[in-house]
């Protein structure tokens, strides 16, 4: 932690100042903590450690936070999100060293007080204005009376001596009037750190701690400060009495007599060997990360550009496979499409060393090491590494292959296999490839959605599924009721599906208790209940029906279940998609009857508007908005309160209201947008 002192001597007693916590390191280009501190309106404290800075926010002298956001350093947006967990309205100005859409979106979602890019013109002035507008100032006293002055002179002297003797850091005092600057005092901690007793140290110069591995430049820096009579801090390697080395952080300050002449030097020694070891380990990790970034940075940019230019799913698969397989970073790549109904993965595209794998089919119901790995990738939705011994297509002798799930929310579109000549792939590289898989999955979903929105007509399909094994049908029969779907929410972080339904059952808790007996139900609860109906939430570990419909690029617009039948209204963009939905449902379920099939003009419906808004909302914002709507939160009087809805999402009320407010803002903005 660094306390930055005001340089303006004009700051007078009673002047109003704003306590500013500067979280993170100073940007290489842009405003630094000292720049703000030069403004007499602010009292700036800089803390570079994330946890320590978060704890400091709670202190009463902190009125505002300036959080630096660096892509490979201090995560200022994550710090803002951490502050918002307990301080919904605390002023936090985020200063990113580089701004992209994700940083801006996260900052807005977390309700940042301000977002000031470090490289922007007059960034310091902009930050200062934001602070002054949002943070209250407090009055500073020039001097605080210390009760120790109530003691007698002798008692005060003894107390201070005891404090020096028992301080947890090494303390020495040297005589500055003697050319040799001999030590005249050491405390107990100095002996603990160095192993030297007072008899061995008093009268000696500090040089006895130095040795062959002591950095001479640091020693010169140390003695320059002493010669020029100013404070200094130096970290250097010193030797203990037993000859062992340790890293010693030495702080030296001159003490002046009544005439203004330096009479003594006080030194503070701290063994920072563990900290230095951690820093060296971190430096090694950063160097390793730099090598990784050099390798994949161009790849990620090219892949992102390719995904943006791709017009449809087929082009997405081709572009991503060609770039990864032939770009030079990896030996080869292939893209396998996942068919949830057939439980197979079929290689659709291959490039580089994997060329020739096109058409290979993996039956996930069969045996084999490669199949087992692919099963785990699909089920766990995590990247896994295989070797040539596993028999994965395109893996040469000695090569390794990363199998990356291509997913969007609860839907798995396929598996991306990346082959490399390096037998071991860094965990962080796997994380980056996993992110690439999610990005590709989102692009495929967008392509399917765009096709539905952009088409001249949309097709509405009505089907009836007479299958008592369907969850809602079976539950309706077991509880003698009916269900009407209000919302189905797929979580992008898990395979789970959150389903909200209404039921006229007079005992909704009995419905919940019955549902909890099903293997697929992870949790269930009554959200709100009235005399006429109740809203019930089911948290499902998976939903084969939802997976099938998502894979086909369709959207459920109505779902009704009774004890024998599930009535389903689905919207798709093309006749081909409609045929695929029907074929997939008939392959999956025994009795599927088509009861409606007609075209709609998108200009006559709000479908496109809803789809674009749905894609603009985050998962949490969409969930908060849907729950508020179906639970009667917007009615008067309210049928459900925000606290109750927050508990159903396992978040605090303030966070729920932030998500809801952001969703409402996007909804209203989309409605009034020209």
Swiss-Prot record:
Disulfide bonds: none
UniProt keyword Transcription present: yes
Record's function text: Involved in activating bop (bacterioopsin) and brp gene expression at low-oxygen tension, which naturally occurs in stationary phase.
Domain HTH bat-type: 617-668
Pfam families the UniProt entry points to: BAT, GAF_2, HTH_10, PAS_9
Presence of keyword DNA-binding: no
Domain GAF: 285-454
Listed Gene3D superfamilies: 3.30.450.40, 3.40.50.2300, PAS domain
Keywords of the record: Activator, Transcription, Transcription regulation
Domain Response regulatory stretches: 19-131
SMART domains with a match to the protein in the record: PAC
GO BP term, pick one: phosphorelay signal transduction system
Domain PAS, residue spans: 156-229
Phylogenetic placement of the source organism: Archaea, Methanobacteriati, Methanobacteriota, Stenosarchaea group, Halobacteria
InterPro entries listed in its UniProt record: BAT_GAF/HTH-assoc, GAF, GAF-like_dom_sf, HTH_bacterioopsin, PAC, PAS, PAS-assoc_C, PAS-like_dom_sf
The protein, known as: Bacterioopsin transcriptional activator
Gene that this sequence comes from: bat
Classification via NCBIfam families: sensory_box (TIGR00229)
Domain PAC: 230-284
